[in-house]
Each structure stands twice: as C-alpha cells, then as structure tokens.
Amino acid sequence: MAEAELPDEAQLGLRLPETRAQRPSGFDLETWAAAARFDIPERAASFIQRVESAAEAYVVRELFRIPGVLYDGGASVYYHGAAIRLQVPASVYRLDLVVQFEEIRLAVEIDGLEHHGLTQAQFARDYYRARRLMIGGFVVVRFTASEAMTQPRQCWRDVFAILKTRSSIERLA
C-alpha cells in the first residue's frame, strides 16, 4: 500500500487498545499486526512491543525504515546521535515518544479523537499537560493519530526538522 493509502483502525476493523491495561488477556501485538496486514521489521519487534496505539506502531515502524537508524535491542533507537525512546515516564505523565539530542528533549505525543474527546475539560487538560512538560524542559510535538497512520515519514521529517532548528548540529537529516 502506498503511504497515503494506509488504512485506519476503523477500516481494518481492528483496534489496538489504547493502553496495555486495556489489552485483553492473551493479546499479542504480532497477532494484531498480522491480522491488520501490518508488517513489523524483524529488528524492530522488541522495540515496537512498547507501543500503546496503532498510530504509534505506524510511526515506530516508519522509524526503522529510515536509513541510518541504529537499534541494539535495548530501550532506545538512535539516529545521528539522537536517542528515541517509547513510553517514557516524565513526572506524573507518560510520554508516547521522547527524542533527545544533547540537551534538547522533544516530547512527541500521538493521539486520536477517541483519546481526547471533544470536551472542553480534556482540551484544558491537554494544554495544562503541555505547559507542565515545557516547564520541565521539553519541546512538545503533537501529531494526530490520522497523521501518524497516513504520513508517518512526514512525522519523522517534522520531528528531526524541529530538532535540527534547536541544535547547532547540521548533521541531522
């Protein structure tokens, strides 16, 4: 499938539970991926197990398709000196992804409407959370689940462009 033609969860009829706690007993990401015709690169299998949504899985899978990405089987993936981690605790929050290069820390959040809802209270909580993260030294980068699933490569381009503009290093692609 071409990148712009990737199906969303509703089209697949398969929904990856939002959190691990919501996953039914015996839930297996690889079984979900096979049913969703979602190929997981072999070297990414242990890292991608940490995702908590289908949208995150699309973005992480795309990360492993970028030339120059290094992964040794641990908690981080590396790209030109930047460390990328999944489900990172930060104060009372857990961040979908953290991309860190030297002192620069990006908090990458990927959420769909089902997570946020359309209530004023949730909207206010999201803005409050973003401010707390910024006070803690993070640059907050947000993507919709739709963007992550249909344009995962562009999400990474944006992340690395933001990182590049905040660093003096020109080697980041």
Residue ranges and their predicted role:
Residues 53-54, 88-89, 120-124:
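Conserved phosphate-coordination/catalytic loops
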Residues 94-127:
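Short beta-strand-loop-alpha-helix junction that forms the active-site gateway
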Residues 43-46, 113-116, 164, 170-171:
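A short, structure-level motif marking secondary-structure boundaries and short turns
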Residues 71-107:
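Active-site metal-binding core of divalent-cation-utilizing nuclease and nuclease-like domains
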Residues 118-163:
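Catalytic cores of nucleic-acid endonucleases
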Residues 1-82, 171-173:
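Solvent-exposed, charged helical/coil patches
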Residues 78, 114, 147:
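Residue-level detector of flexible, active-site-proximal loop/helix-junction positions
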Residues 103, 159-173:
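Short, basic, helix/turn surface patches
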